[in-house]
Amino acid sequence: MRINRTVLYFIIVISFFFFNFYFRPVQGNPLMTGKYKNSSAYVNNLYVSDEFFKKNSMNKDEYYIYEHLIDDVKKGKGHSIIKCKTKGCSATYMTAYEAIYLDHPELIAFQSSSWKESDNTLDVSYLLLGKLQAFLGTRRIEREISIVQKETKNMTDKEKILFVYNYVASHDYDHLFMYSSSNQSAYSFFTKGTSVCAGFAKASQLLFQNIGIKSYLVMNTDHMWNYVEYEGKYYVFDATMGTGFRKDSNNYYSGLGETTVGVTKGYFENIYPPIEDTKLRTVFGV
């Protein structure tokens, strides 16, 4: 039986598309090990989390909710009931939620949550990506990261940091849907090409780890950014700043030392390493 040429051409194009974006061999995260994959911290191959915020900021109640929440999300549960051990469930939940947000930028399936508190019990609902969507999204992001790994392979740390800044800032800020839950993870950045500060910061965090640069995620009520290490010191890094300016603008590199919201302190500030007052753009001379 002869196959129609149009059909054959379509099959070839589709096969190439899926291979290139989802199944092409990649280098992978250099920190990923079999031991880590068997740990409770493992979510996917994008990121190795040391769960810094869980280990350094949680009391017993917050730790309990953190474990409960992330376990439910990894299992794809859309709803759960959490029995709190002490009063003040909502505040405890928010602290745990924020810590997970910072510890796990690779958790692309988790878009948002809502909850009701009654009789020291939380009734929590999660908005999650579908399992297939999350699987394909993870595969796509792995392949996007691999391109950056190849581009930065022989770069100095300064060149790598500038590369990530330029790469992230080249994407568009989604002003139309800036409060959409779908924009709050790295998924929107890597698969749609648009995002908001949360997506930009999480994408930066994933990229930094995969190319050998140490960094932290930072957030407050209004914004999310990074602290990045350069020559043993930590500096403010906010690629969202770059999305608002042309690359030839004097303000383009403002994010190497400033944040979009004008503050450089976030939640859990007391557990971060000291942050330099000197702007990274001054150190880099850009």
Please give the residue ranges for each predicted region:
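Secondary-structure boundary elements
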Residues: F135-F189
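Repeated polar recognition positions within modular binding domains
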Residues: S80, H171-M178, T191, G242, ...
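Hydrophobic/aromatic-rich core segments of domains that either
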Residues: G199-G262
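Short, charged/polar micro-motifs that form catalytic or ligand-binding hotspots
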Residues: T86, N154, F190-T194, A198
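Conserved active-site-adjacent core of cysteine acyl-enzyme catalytic domains
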Residues: S181-F189, S195, A203-L206, D248
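N-terminal accessory/pre-domain segments preceding catalytic cores
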Residues: F18-M155, K265-V286
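Sec-dependent N-terminal signal peptides of Gram-positive bacterial secreted proteins and lipoproteins
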Residues: R2-P25
